[in-house]
Amino acid sequence: KSINSTSLIYFTIMSDILTLTLKKYWGFDFFRPLQKDIIKSVLDGHDTLGLMPTGGGKSITFQVPGMILEGLTLVITPLISLMKDQVDNLKRHNIRAVYFHAGMTHREATTAWDKLINSKCKFLYVSPERLSSERFCNELKSLNIRLIVIDEAHCISQWGYDFRPSYLNIKKIRKIIPNAPFLALTATATPEVVTDIC
């Protein structure tokens, strides 16, 4: 089956944009295996499951499209230390990002929200527990969220070794933000866990 010239040009241009973005912000010349396939799926608007080994570069699969898309990328992650590390790392690359978790004081949350609204952030990291707040979820409606990432997605599944009931709050987000694709990322998942995630 031949690919028409318009499609070929599109794929070539998109591939160049992805590689240039990777180089500009992270200094890498090449993607690792599976990264580009996952990124292209997300940019085509598809809900996507990314099964990649620990250390395989899962963060790049949402950070690169997050820089290309107009608007905000919402990242749901269970570990506060991990979200802090990722936000700090993005800031070192001159990328604006904030985080919210259930343990923040009112003042900390207000300061983070002000940064989110006033500084054109590209990434918003939240703990799944934060999504239990109806007020917080309603505030998400006012944001231009273009991609939703579920890190450690195996925590969704009751079959998983690390099931977290708070991950069930993620269902609300689909109703609140129906048009943004979901990217679920995990290093390991049995067939039962994959079925639950999908």
Question: Model regions: which residues?
Answer:
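Conserved pre-motif I regulatory segment
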Residues: 14-53
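Pre-Walker A (Motif I) flank of P-loop NTPase domains
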Residues: 44-50, 71-72, 120-122
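Walker A/P-loop
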Residues: 45-64, 76
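Conserved phosphate-coupling serine/threonine residues in phosphotransfer and NTP-handling enzymes
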Residues: 54-56, 127, 186-188
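Conserved nucleic-acid-binding Ia/Ib motif block in the N-terminal RecA-like helicase ATPase lobe
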Residues: 74, 80-126
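Conserved helix/coil segment N-terminal to the catalytic DExD/H
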Residues: 105-147, 157-161
